[in-house]
């Protein structure tokens, strides 16, 4: 008990010194918002060992977003996935965001409610509807949690520091209730230094009572008029002797021929050479089951037919491999190809009503 009280005390102290910005980890000022956004894809996946591919059309995302100013420095934001798997823990499972934000000054903000865990990296920071062939960590981490956060924003707006205490995602993985007592402590820095942008975080994520997984996620991005390029590094460790065994990289570069048309290339590598897997589910270790190494790489393009960018068309193709040792001790590699074509569109009702 003393250990847990100490952890909460440290989190309270750190609450004053750290926060994120942009997209997923959002600390920009909330403006009036009333939107529906939709993404539908046609997908073709063929495993090397399969006789026939899996293919078809499906709805990827259908999101409702509502946000605005409540006065007196208070604002709110709500985002619900209308099409989603039924929740297994609470009604809030399919709610990405539902928080109250208070901004007493231009530099300080506090927030409470359903929010994204304050984790670094540009792939993680992007809204899910904008992510193509993601990493295993992105696929598996249960990142939307009830949380309390505090942020400090510099006068020029270029740096945001956040400290956050949230429910641990292992509450969801283990099928527990919110009062199971598992928590996560997250520290985050978002920085803009000329053309260089950063999204860095370090976290202690409780996976069982008083047992923690350390997560370090570091993202750097170069941004210019015609192109941008980011590299994210993700690292997990259960103990000091576990460092360097469970990590991954993901990198993506965009070239913008016009403001409405860009091509991108993306690649990633992830490995888990830890001695143990947390639980029976692959998702328990966020990235991979122990003993697995995966690589994924591909390219594609995006086209916005209109300048307001309310409609987006995309096409991409990628290759994935998974290397591991089977139960007989033999080294194996399995691979697959994935091709995807889709459309995303946004219905901005607030802008329509203003007109």
Predicted features along the sequence, with ranges:
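Beta-barrel outer-membrane channel/assembly domains of diderm bacteria
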Residues: 21-110, 150-155, 161, 254, ...
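Exposed loop/turn and edge beta-strand positions of beta-sandwich/beta-sheet ligand-binding modules
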Residues: 60, 94, 106, 144, ...
């Amino acid at each position: 008990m003393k250990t847990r009280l100490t952890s909460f005390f440290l989190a309270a102290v750190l609450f004053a010194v750290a926060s994120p910005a942009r997209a997923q980890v959002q600390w920009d000022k909330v403006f009036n918002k009333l939107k529906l956004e939709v993404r539908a894809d046609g997908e073709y996946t063929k495993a090397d060992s399969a006789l026939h591919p899996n293919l078809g059309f499906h709805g990827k995302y259908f999101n409702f977003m509502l946000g605005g100013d409540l006065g007196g420095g208070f604002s709110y934001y709500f985002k619900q996935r209308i099409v989603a798997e039924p929740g297994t823990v609470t009604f809030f499972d399919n709610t990405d965001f539902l928080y109250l934000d208070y901004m007493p000054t231009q530099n300080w903000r506090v927030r409470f409610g359903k929010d994204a865990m304050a984790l670094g990296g540009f792939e993680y920071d992007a809204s899910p509807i904008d992510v193509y062939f993601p990493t295993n960590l992105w696929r598996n981490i249960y990142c939307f949690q009830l949380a309390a956060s505090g942020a400090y924003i510099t006068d020029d707006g270029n740096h945001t520091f956040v400290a956050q205490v949230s429910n641990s995602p292992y509450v969801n993985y283990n099928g527990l209730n919110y009062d199971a007592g598992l928590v996560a402590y997250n520290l985050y820095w978002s920085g803009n230094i000329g053309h260089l942008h950063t999204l860095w975080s370090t976290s202690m994520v409780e996976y069982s009572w008083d047992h923690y997984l350390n997560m370090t996620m570091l993202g750097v991005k170069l941004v210019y008029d015609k192109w941008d390029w980011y590299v994210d590094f993700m690292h997990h460790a259960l103990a000091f002797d576990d460092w360097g065994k469970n990590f991954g990289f993901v990198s993506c570069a965009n070239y913008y021929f016009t403001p409405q048309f860009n091509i991108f290339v993306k690649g990633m590598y992830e490995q888990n050479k830890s001695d143990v897997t947390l639980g029976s589910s692959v998702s328990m270790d966020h990235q991979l089951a122990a003993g697995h190494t995966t690589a994924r790489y591909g390219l594609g393009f995006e086209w916005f037919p209109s300048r307001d960018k309310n409609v987006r068309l995309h096409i991409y193709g990628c290759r994935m491999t998974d290397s591991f040792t089977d139960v007989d001790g033999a080294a194996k590699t399995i691979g697959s190809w994935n091709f995807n074509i889709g459309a995303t569109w946004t219905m901005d009702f607030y802008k329509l009503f203003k007109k």
